[in-house]
Amino acid sequence: MVAMILRQKVVSDPLRCGRLSQLRPFGHNCSRSILTQSRTYDDALHKLSLIASNRRITSMFDQKSASASHSNLNAQAIPEMLTSLRQAGYAPEDLASIRHIHVAGTKGKGSVCAFATSLLLQHKDRLYGTAVGTYTSPHLISPRERIAVDGQPVEKDVFTEAVFEIWDRFTEVGKTEMGLSVEDAEGAASKPFYFRFMTILAWHIFLKLGIRDVVMECGIGGEYDATNILPPANVSAAVITQLGIDHVAMLGDTVEKIAWHKAGILKSNATGFTRNLSQQPEVMEVLRQRAAEKQGQLVEIDDALVEGWGGVQGNLKGDFQRHNQALALLAVKQHLDLDADPKSTLSNVSSDEARGLQAARLRGRCEVVSQEDITWYLDGAHTNESLEQVATWFKQSTPPDAQSILIFNQQERDASHLLAHFLSCMDRPTAFSHALFTRNEQTKAEDAQDTSVQAAAAGKMAEMAPECQTAVFNNIQDTVAEAKRLARETGGRVLVTGSLHLVGGVLQALEPGSVS
């Protein structure tokens, strides 16, 4: 009853300074400077840009230090997130009105979230609320893409108001509890790092809007992820998508170690769903052990069952998507308290469910944009496995003898290694007449930028495809302009891959001001 009273306060009285200062109207003891600041959408985006980036946090794991230090950083993550939630005026029990489909994995998380959201929209009569909330990351163009309502980025005015509400709560705590100066408290010093802030912001918005059905994607890992402060009762279904090597410093250097982290989202009262990796028995054993440890049920979906079903052709391309569709179908069935048996579910997909799978959209993943007689193929793949899928998709989507333009970058991983693996999967070294390598900055910076990563990738391209002409750029706008010029001369096809940040920048260049 207490939690329900507090939760109602959150919805009806969102402009408050925080639980620690007791529930009270916004403005009580809040500084005059807070009340007189400009509070437009652009101001909200500027505030978010000041917060410590996720990269600054993950770089702490990249530093050469004892593994014990890494363990300590991981162990601190959940307590720190709980503290941040409390500073924002909430406690985990305030989330009790929301039922979550929680998704972790190395690849396919975004696709599963898109499919699950679209499926829930086909079942609106069975929802626990009136709308579907979705929280994903990263964004491609605008931060509000991360927080969606009924499959669309949250409205600008709702987003703007919510950013400042949460910002002010942390500011007040910075002054009253952290002993910061007014200037520091009103800035980024009193705020959690970006992903934690956005996660709290998402819950704040969902609670304000009365949303009770949410699809939530983990950021990195699972066990220590900011989203994993959810009480077990608030998770209706957990999904572990395809696993692979990524974020090694944080999660470990083997798939088994990474599986341990991902399976951290399994809960005692929630059924978990995953693909039965018959070729990786060691990985499956880790997942099963973790399910037993968490006292949760793990449903393993056999590939033969999914292949026999065949999936639904829709906006999200690629044969591999049938596995993501199956996971989403089962998770949604479980969320809605329907029969979630894999065999019966996949053999009895309704027309509404088929429409939901077909209609699902996820920008920047196997996306095709046609503009000015040029076809742009965009996928933010950034691991060996996902680049293999991009190669398959691109070969299936273009004539066998066609030449195209490649735009590639990967700023945080071994770009040359990833490029080489991708080219080996393309089978045909002459697939690209030109390859453009760029940093992820949108426009040209005043200061000189380090393009050594791009130069090394261009060298690898010249080594593996000597006939391909290469060029290095320090910004996306110039790269897109050159790609347009070249594409008009060489058949009008451009493939953009290697990084979601790159894909987002290219989309922004192609569609200025676009979000959804």
Model features per residue range: what roles?
Residues 62-69, 88-97, 121-233, 251, ...:
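ATP-dependent carboxylate-amine ligase catalytic core
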Residues 48, 106, 132, 215, ...:
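Residue-level signal for inorganic ion chemistry
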Residues 201-250, 281-315:
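Extended acidic/charged loop-beta regions that coordinate divalent cations
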Residues 500-516:
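Glycine/aspartate-rich loop-and-adjacent alpha/beta segment that forms the canonical ThDP
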Residues 259-266:
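Membrane-proximal helix-turn-helix segments that form the acceptor-binding/catalytic region
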Residues 277-299, 322, 375-376, 422-493:
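C-terminal helical cap/extension that packs against the catalytic core
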Residues 213-216, 226-239, 243-247, 257, ...:
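Nucleotide phosphate-binding/pyrophosphate-handling subdomain across enzymes
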Residues 2-105, 111-124, 135, 178-182, ...:
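Short functional linear segments
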